[in-house]
Amino acid sequence: VMKHAYGETIIKEKPKKIVTLNWNNADSILALGLVPVGTSKMNWGSVTSKGLLPWTEAKFKELGVDNPNVFNDLDGYDYEAIAGANPDIIIAPYSGMEEKEYKRLSEIAPTVPFKDVAWKTTWRDQLLEASEAVGMKDEGEKLVEETENFIKDNVAKYPNLSGKSAALCYIDAAD
């Protein structure tokens, strides 16, 4: 059972066909070594001709998929295309999914939207929620630990960063 902003989603068995919607959610699933049967087109950053961020496309290729199923949901979810992927689960812990969208997507497959506040899920929670939803909680916890250690080890190489913080923003002409 996954608790979230719109209640809870019951996942009866480990999903095999996973759809990821909105930003970055495919990355969590791919990091677990799973391949989404469909994912959202990216609308920020330097995207590839397939509509993915370069590292996302590279991970798809590493996992044997040269032409992933990418949904153009920039103006709203493409429910027909999502249903056409025949998912066992829809994952979107980092999203701005509205309740009416959640209800409609839940008619297609069990859906896991953001837990508390739209677009506020940290990378850690995004990975942990996605890994729990697909029955790989331990693997997700291990990935978080490995990533935190990677960050810590690399920041330690630059002592002048001690006590500093940073903000990253992406702004384009549409903003």
Per-range role (PLM):
Residues 16-20, 73-77, 96-99, 117-124, ...:
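Soluble non-cytosolic domains of exported or imported proteins
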